[in-house]
Amino acid sequence: MKPFGLSPLDIDAIFLTHEHTDHCRALKSFNKGRARVFANRLTAESVMCAEPETKRLEWSIFENGSEFGFSGLSVSPFSTPHDSSDSVGYCFCAGGKRLVWMTDLGKVTFLARDFAQRANILVLESNYCPRMLENSPRPYSLKSRIKGSHGHLSNADAVALLKTMDSSVSEKIYLAHISRECNSVPHIRELLSGVGEILPKIEIVSPFSESSTPYDDGEA
């Protein structure tokens, strides 16, 4: 947030996908702000149990598969397979356009594929290169979790989905949630050549940049 000149006071809403630390560790920084935090019940309960300070936030609880509105947006959360309490992706609609956020899923379900294929803008996980993961010093249990059906999408998994996309519908695709240790931009590009007409619309969100670090206001 800091590289963009933003603070918690500037944020109106936070949409949680799940409770893992890399997604919500800075949430308590918003205690002094006005942001509403949207999450399903299991995710909210898990976060508040791990970080009691977050109980002071303004929580808005939804059910997966339900549609709700916020500030001119139509928001549809959908279930995703991940090793968390109740992980979701999001579809945000406004002005006839759809933005779909889809990270942290071990496989592309029929539901996730449907949302992705109807997205004008898609944020899609391309988390790891299998070869780099296998050669990494990570323990076997972690490698198995990442590769599992409730882990993360590999580069090949992401590309397989991209090959099903309609270039007349997709306007922009961001490949994100890229592992710093077990992936690289060249490894992703190596596979992208086979995606067809949609290739010029794809942007890789590199993790090797200070701008991707989470907001931290310096308070304990």
Model features per residue range: what roles?
Residues 1-39:
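Active-site metal-binding motif and surrounding structural segment of the metallo-beta-lactamase
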Residues 2-9, 25, 62-121, 213-220:
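Core dinuclear metal-dependent hydrolase active-site scaffold
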Residues 12-22, 38-41, 100-103, 123-125, ...:
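Active-site neighborhood of phospho(di)ester-bond hydrolases with catalytic His/Asp-centered motifs
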Residues 20-24, 45-46, 84-85, 108-110, ...:
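Active-site environment of divalent metal-dependent phosphoester hydrolases
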Residues 25-34, 48-50, 183-190:
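Metal-dependent catalytic neighborhoods of phosphoester/phosphodiester hydrolases
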